[in-house]
Amino acid sequence: MDKEFKVLDKGFIRLVDYMGTDARIVQSARVSYGEGTKTVREDAALIDYLLRNKHTSPFEQVVFTFHVKLPIFVARQWIRHRTARLNEISGRYSILKAEFYVPAGKDIALQSSDNKQGRMNEAVPQDLQNEVITSLQKQQEEIYAGYSKLLDKNIARELARINLPLSTYTEWYWQIDLHNLFHFLRLRMDAHAQKEIRDYAEVMFEICKTVTPLACASFERHEKNGVNFSAEELEAIRNLIAGKDSGLKGKELERFNEKLKSGRQV
């Protein structure tokens, strides 16, 4: 606890505090019939049962508080998860630091040809990487210089800040229960999520494992590395087991085959 885990070029995640562990989950689940903690194996089986069957309230008994430093564009995706409590540094009260996210060269890629909100997997050539990085840094320096000039003229901080870029780093305290944290992690560790927020989610999951290893193991088995099948897809599986054609066609068949091949939700 209190250790900073580096994320991106200047960001971090730090576990400030937590309430409850795996033991709290099993104790709250068993309270209805008065039985306390049993063996680790029995506790693991109970936690696995609860997660598989979506009995969520015992997981809500465990609460984490994180201190996070992250670029504003990542924060704006993060804040879509409204089942948490947070306090963020204010640009109205504080002078924001000249700290901006600059992607590593290997992460600079062209727009995806088949995904309107994503990038291609391959990095652009080295010369273009250098050009993009130089351009980003120059723009960031120029904008921050303008911000500083406005502050020097005693312009209100709440106005001086408005041109600062989405790459500016912000900080917040973020508190969330384990059930809703698992929902956040399931979405933000997924391959469809933007790489930068995925980096934060993966570090957060590693921290979570140190507090609730049994719950995280079940989450990894059923949610992170599992997929859901529709009624039609289940029927297709039955057909394949029986040696028949799947019965699916077109996009439905493509999605079904991709699920089986990749082991992830599509």
UniProtKB/Swiss-Prot annotation:
Catalytic activity: dUMP + (6R)-5,10-methylene-5,6,7,8-tetrahydrofolate + NADPH + H(+) = dTMP + (6S)-5,6,7,8-tetrahydrofolate + NADP(+)
Superkingdom of origin organism: Bacteria
Domain ThyX: 11-222
InterPro entries per the UniProt record, alphabetical: Thymidylate_synthase_ThyX, Thymidylate_synthase_ThyX_sf
Annotated binding of FAD, by residue: 57, 80-82, 88, 177-179, 183
EC supergroup of this enzyme: transferase
Keyword annotations from UniProtKB, A to Z: FAD, Flavoprotein, Methyltransferase, NADP, Nucleotide biosynthesis, Transferase
CC cofactor note: Binds 4 FAD per tetramer. Each FAD binding site is formed by three monomers.
Binding site for dUMP: 77-80, 88-92, 161, 188
Gene3D superfamilies named among the record's database cross-references: 3.30.1360.170
Residue numbers covered by motif ThyX motif: 80-90
Keyword Cell wall biogenesis/degradation: no
A biological-process GO annotation: dTTP biosynthetic process
Pathway assignment: Pyrimidine metabolism; dTTP biosynthesis
GO molecular function term, any single one: flavin adenine dinucleotide binding
Cofactor: FAD
Enzyme Commission number(s): 2.1.1.148
Active-site residue numbers: 188 (involved in ionization of n3 of dump, leading to its activation)
Family from the record: Belongs to the thymidylate synthase ThyX family.
Function in brief: Catalyzes the reductive methylation of 2'-deoxyuridine-5'-monophosphate (dUMP) to 2'-deoxythymidine-5'-monophosphate (dTMP) while utilizing 5,10-methylenetetrahydrofolate (mTHF) as the methyl donor, and NADPH and FADH(2) as the reductant.
Subunit and interaction comment: Homotetramer.
Record protein name field: Flavin-dependent thymidylate synthase
Organismal lineage: Bacteria, Pseudomonadati, Spirochaetota, Spirochaetia, Spirochaetales
